[in-house]
Amino acid sequence: MRHIAMKAQWTDFITLLKREVVPALGCTEPMSVALAAANCRKLLGQVPTRVSVWVSGNLFKNGMGVGVPGTGMIGLPVAAAVGITGGNPDAGLEVLKALTPAQVEEAKVLLPAIKVDVKDVPDVLYAEVLAQVEGHSARVVICTDHTRIILMERDGEVLMAQDSAPGVQIQAAPSSKPAMTLREIVEFALQVPLAEIDFIREAATMNQALADEGLQGYGLRIGKILTEQVERKLLSDDLMTLAMRLSSAASDARMDGAMLPAMSNSGSGNQGIAATMPVVAAARFLQASDEQLTRALVMSHLVAIYIKTYQNKLSALCAASTAAMGAGAAITWLLGGQFEQISHCINNMIGDVSGIICDGAGSACSMKVSTSTSAAVKSSLMAINNLHVPQSEGIVSDDVDQTIANLGRLSKQGMLDTDIEIINIMRAKQQGKAE
């Protein structure tokens, strides 16, 4: 194979992948609260007697009903409690990796002293924890990114503060375009020297372990149920079923608090699962080589990041469905498709699943991951037969990059009221006032 020189953009792509595809233990929104709480405990030097937590509406939405790893419990108060009693303030999204049963019991005692409320802030991702004990206090604020601490205070003294605008933005401003195109991503994935992207294989290893755990029976048991139906001959042991089984099983385990990390994408474990496991399933089913799997995973994850750049970090649009579009692109390539067919696949998926809402993280996420995975396989099979949604329909354009931008516009501008109503409904449920 001839040597291909690295392009400057390719180096940027590798940096982007290494920043956005990282391990995360537990749903990332509660982990932000746990991380802030763990840092409060570090500043105080002791367990507080009162803890106040304020979060953005979107973080509240994604933390209300999801399992906290190692606890058997759900919700943001639990995340704050175990963050204080057993969180590692230096471990980022793996803040609860070393949590012990004794620390969980200690957290249960602390739970009545924890209050969580929604704060009206401009940032969709915001977590603030104030911990108090015997005349002392500590405050930590995380903003714009799941692990980005922008404020640390002890006894009212500011120890660290920075502007809430991120130092490195991956999200596109409404009037700007990301510094990449789908064609550039595909070219990179297929031509970059293999040694430069070998690291992406860890996503397959990590998320496969999560899928194996999920098949034991977690959450809604979607992956386990699908597997049982294959054994009963009610479902075929085909590509689509395998992809759905592995993807939903990994999500089942993650959403139900399994003590295993997921390789995330753009700050979300389910996005990482949706970008990884359908590709792993396709590579296994098609008996692809290690190199093919590696390049397919890079294509999938980078496409998922690209599509996400047009959207807010948290929104009313299910991000697992958009991450699965990356998987669809990679599966199309594994099936022999070229750039034209890869474009068709993404257009097909946007024409199919672009309306799935995010009504918070929870066990039902595995259903949405499963649905999006099936759409990825279906769209790939259509694409390699040169079948695609025509540009005359809906938000689909002949130019796939424009279609992706249209989806971002739908998410970022068109679904704002949807997001508000979802949050209002969930808050009313929590307060026992849902009508």
Swiss-Prot record:
GO terms for biological process: L-cysteine catabolic process to pyruvate. It comes from the Bacteria. InterPro entries: Ser_deHydtase-like_asu, UPF0597. Signal peptide: none annotated. One of its GO terms (molecular function) is L-cysteine desulfhydrase activity. Pfam families: SDH_alpha. Belongs to the UPF0597 family. PANTHER family: UPF0597 PROTEIN YHAM. This is UPF0597 protein AHA_4077.
